[in-house]
Swiss-Prot record:
Posttranslational modification: Methylated by PrmC. Methylation increases the termination efficiency of RF2.
Family recorded in the similarity comment: Belongs to the prokaryotic/mitochondrial release factor family.
GO molecular function, one term: translation release factor activity, codon specific
Keyword Cytoplasm set for record: yes
Positions of modified residues (N5-methylglutamine): Q252
Broad class of the protein's primary localization: cytoplasm
UniProt entry keywords in alphabetical sequence: Cytoplasm, Methylation, Protein biosynthesis
Provenance organism: Xanthomonas euvesicatoria pv. vesicatoria (strain 85-10) (Xanthomonas campestris pv. vesicatoria)
The keyword Lipid metabolism is assigned to this record: no
Name the UniProt record assigns to this protein: Peptide chain release factor 2
Amino acid sequence: MIETNPIRQRITDLNDRVLSLRGIFDYDAKKERLEEVSRELESPDVWNDAERAQALGRERSMLEKTVIGIADVLSGLADAGDLLELAESEQDEDTALAVIADLDNYQAHVEKLEFQRMFSGQMDSANAFVDIQAGAGGTEAQDWAEILLRMYLRWAESRGWKTELMEVSGGEVAGIKSATVRIEGEYAYGWLKTEIGVHRLVRKSPFDSDNRRHTSFTSVFVSPEVDDNIEIDINPADLRTDVYRSSGAGGQHVNKTESAVRITHIPTNTVVACQTGRSQHQNRDNAMKMLAAKLYELEVQKRNAEKDALEATKSDIGWGSQIRNYVLDQSRIKDLRTGIERSDTQKVLDGDLDEFVEASLKAGLAAGSKRLDA
């Protein structure tokens, strides 16, 4: 018969971790909210407002992951304790080994719940807008911007998230000057917010006949899609609206009539554009959502800058700082914040970003997170 004291200690340790998470997640309040949302969704009138019904459905799904997840693990650990006692009384080694296998499963669940702690920010559960802006450097920089756009689209798709290209401005020879993509998925903004910053590419340029090494920069900005429950005060007098004909990359997904809309928020010089809707009205509505998201994120970063003097020294709060180097001719991609380094560069550019993003999230949590919305 194997030694059972370490198994019993493991049950106790896992139980303590789950009880700690129960407090961190405010389990009782979430359970009560889950019951409220479930009752609302059972009402025959709920689908009179389809948008609200869908939002409630998403909220229920996220609440269930926490509430049911914690309840199931606590129940399973109690059963494991009973089963271990039975194994001890009957000297049944097979049963004891089955308990160990169960504990491996529960530990994986606990680790997932602990990772979820990183998504405690007010807007972390929101969908996200990702803005990609090519830096100086002409065609090489614009090609780099398109490579990054593809990388994020592939990563989002690998997670089963929905993507929608809201605006794209084609490059003069190749690539793109800028693009905005909406990403809809569970904790999309929570996952993507660590990607804000400047991404640096070093490679032998395919656009250089002498095959020289070039350095290019692209800025990535991520903002949460703001729902109607969040107050964002936008004065219509502060807006300049331009209508234009869609152009550049985008193919069949971009409307070619003169219905594209560009809105400038004059006080902050924040510009958003949308060209994928079927009408000028639809594009304007989408652009206003994008503007609200951007202004929210800028306000969060402004507050962080005021809170932390180091943040205030950044050259451009809106775009953050250089976060990752992609040195392709040396097969090396390195995150400058976490030290994570990969040599399988094509796999990363094909959307294998989990290791980088998870490390950034964990580093942010360990540091207590400088974000005020966290």
